C-alpha cells in the first residue's frame, strides 16, 4: 500500500491525538528528560493551538509527526522570535520529506522572525537544517 502523507493544522478535536504522540517522544527519549505530566503536555498543546503553531503529519490518516512553536521574547529585547517547542516524528516514519515539510511550515509561520530550533535529543541532523537555511548557533550543554 502506498503511503500518502498529509500535513495540516489539527482541529481542536485532534489535540488529544497530538498529546498522545508527544508522549511517544517521552517513551523514546525518557532517559534524557524528566517524567512527562499529562496535564502539562495537554496545557502546552492547547496553548500552542490558540497562540502558536501546531502542524501535524498524517500517513493514511494516522498521526505520525508534529511540530509546535510559539512566539517568545528575547530576554534583552522586546523583539519577538519563534521558539520551537517540539519537533517529533515516529521512528519508522522519519525521512527527509516529512521533516522538511514540517520545518517549512515552521519557517512560513515565522514569517520574518528568527526561529530558534534547539536539538536536545542527541539526534542532530545538520544537513537537514543546512538545506533549509538554518544556521548552527552552538550546542546545548547539560549537567545532570
Task: Show which residues each predicted segment covers.
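Conserved acyl-CoA
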Residues: 98-114
Amino acid at each position: 500500500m502506498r503511503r500518502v502523507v498529509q500535513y495540516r493544522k489539527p482541529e481542536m478535536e485532534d489535540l488529544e491525538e497530538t498529546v498522545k504522540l508527544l508522549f511517544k517522544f517521552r517513551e523514546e527519549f525518557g532517559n534524557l528528560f524528566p517524567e512527562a505530566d499529562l496535564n502539562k503536555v495537554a496545557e502546552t498543546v492547547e496553548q500552542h493551538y490558540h497562540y502558536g503553531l501546531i502542524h501535524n503529519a498524517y500517513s493514511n490518516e494516522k498521526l505520525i509527526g508534529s511540530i509546535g512553536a510559539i512566539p517568545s521574547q528575547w530576554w534583552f529585547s522586546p523583539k519577538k522570535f519563534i521558539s520551537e517547542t517540539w519537533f517529533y516524528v515516529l521512528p519508522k516514519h522519519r525521512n527527509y520529506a516529512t521533516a522538511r515539510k514540517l520545518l517549512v511550515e515552521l519557517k512560513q509561520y515565522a514569517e520574518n522572525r528568527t526561529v530558534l530550533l534547539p536539538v536536545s535529543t542527541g539526534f542532530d541532523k545538520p544537513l537537514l537544517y543546512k538545506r533549509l537555511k538554518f544556521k548552527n548557533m552552538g550546542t546545548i550543554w547539560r549537567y545532570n
